[in-house]
Amino acid sequence: MTAKFLRSSAVLIAFALAVSVGAKVSTAQYGGGGRDIPAQPSQPAAEKGDKSEKGEKPAKVNKAEEAAYKALYTARTGTPESQIPLCEDFIAKFPQSHYLVGVYSQLTSAYFAADQIDKMFAAGTKAVELNPDNIDVLALLAMAMSRRVKPSMPDAKQQYEKAETYAHHAIELIPNMAKPDTIDDATFEKAKNDKLAMAHSGLGLIDLQVHDKPEDARTELTQAVQLASNPDPVDYYLLGNADVKASYFNDAVAAYEKCAATGPLVAACKSRQESAKKDATTKMGR
């Protein structure tokens, strides 16, 4: 899952900052978007000019803040290891900055890519507190929380409900996003679909493992693998499990085959594929 994110993080983080840093800001990988149309790209003040619409005097620029944000903005397509200290340092030095929502969004994605999941949840929660319509973070948390939370945890019910709320809200917001001028149509659609895929992935896992609704899980997980520009093998694994539980054994064989091609679950997928093949010949399937 993390490797998949790393392959696409450059485009997604660039997209996240483009639609997220402003009056209504967002980053979830894979924040962007708001209840209203998301703000246009927020670049360092030295690049965009900080003049008011009424011709008033420009707001006083904190040169240290602008320099720090410029370095962070430039690093948005780099490795998570290069972004994390810049984001953390910015937050510590400028806790009241108007750039803060975008910084927390970028930090959430960077923590996820670096597999620092607990820190990712903390940063993501802060990003959503600052902007409840942060599409990037909503989608990322919906997917990551559903995989991280275990039914045995004391607060599992509340965490699953929160993940579902994040997923549904992201799915509600994404179709109404406005394309930033800095991004072409194809890149914009790809980014939107990748976010939708993450939200549907989270819902599918919860339908399967929490609500015991394999048919609903199949619907959500099918959307996840169809929408994703680079489908997550974990989603194919979960889809195969949902297929088996709903007695779609031949579909399960196909899902496990795709899961077994790459990723962290190759051995498990191959084993389950063989089991599904036997079920297809010995059990009443659909």
Residue ranges and their predicted role:
Residues T77, A114, R148, K157, ...:
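Structural motif corresponding to the intra-repeat A-B loop/turn of tetratricopeptide repeats
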Residues A68-A71, Y104, L138, M145, ...:
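TPR repeat positional signature
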Residues G22-G102, R286:
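N-terminal leader/linker segments that initiate helical-solenoid repeat arrays
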Residues S109, M143, R147-K150, L205, ...:
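Residue-level recognition of tetratricopeptide repeat
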Residues G32-G34, P180-T182, N193-L205, Q209, ...:
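Terminal, low-structured helical/coil segments at or just beyond the last alpha-helical repeat
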Residues K93-L100, L130-I135, P175-D194, Q226-P231, ...:
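Short solvent-exposed coil/turn linkers within tandem alpha-helical repeat scaffolds
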